[in-house]
Amino acid sequence: MENFIGSHMIYTYENGWEYEIYIKNDHTIDYRIHSGMVAGRWVRDQEVNIVKLTEGVYKVSWTEPTGTDVSLNFMPNEKRMHGIIFFPKWVHEHPEITVCYQNDHIDLMKESREKYETYPKYVVPEFAEITFLKNEGVDNEEVISKAPYEGMTDDIRAGRL
């Protein structure tokens, strides 16, 4: 797992949604969403479960304060990932509520989860191509430290950020 921890990745799902993740340590991630249903959302210090399934294959899973469940299988050597996201009904119907720096709005996420319907879940199972991969070390607070903006992933891939 030591080669996986510290990984900073940008990946694009087959449906076109572009995400960025930093495996901060063995139990925490930071991420930004650059396109898709909740583009503009970003989160730091999300508690996760990380396991090595077999050589070169890692699973990262978590439940968010929104009630969204996520399970991602990374195959960095293959530049592939398979993810499945279980969005609660309310997130699918009101995604704009979640498009923020979640850490500053945890109470709003919990209130919305209680206020709106959560079922049926909107399930998104997709493969993705990893388009950027760099090990940034453990607990690097600079990797994901600002809101996503138009062209950010191009800046990261070009080394400008």
From Swiss-Prot:
Changing residue 98 to A: 76% decarboxylation of ferulic acid. Coiled coil: none annotated. The keyword Ribosomal protein does not apply. Disruption phenotype: No longer metabolizes ferulic acid. Induction: By ferulic, p-coumaric and caffeic acids (at protein level). Cells extracts from caffeic acid-induced cells exhibited lower activity on the three acids, which indicates that caffeic acid could be a less efficient inducer. Up-regulated by salicylate. GO terms for molecular function: carboxy-lyase activity. Optimum pH is 5.0. Changing residue 19 to A: 4% decarboxylation of ferulic acid. Keywords: Aromatic hydrocarbons catabolism, Decarboxylase, Detoxification, Lyase. Pfam families: PA_decarbox. The active site is at residues 19, 64. Changing residue 68 to V: 52% decarboxylation of ferulic acid. CDD domains: PAD. Its EC number is 4.1.1.102. Involved in the decarboxylation and detoxification of phenolic derivatives. It is able to catalyze the decarboxylation of ferulic, p-coumaric and caffeic acids. This is Phenolic acid decarboxylase PadC. The gene is padC.
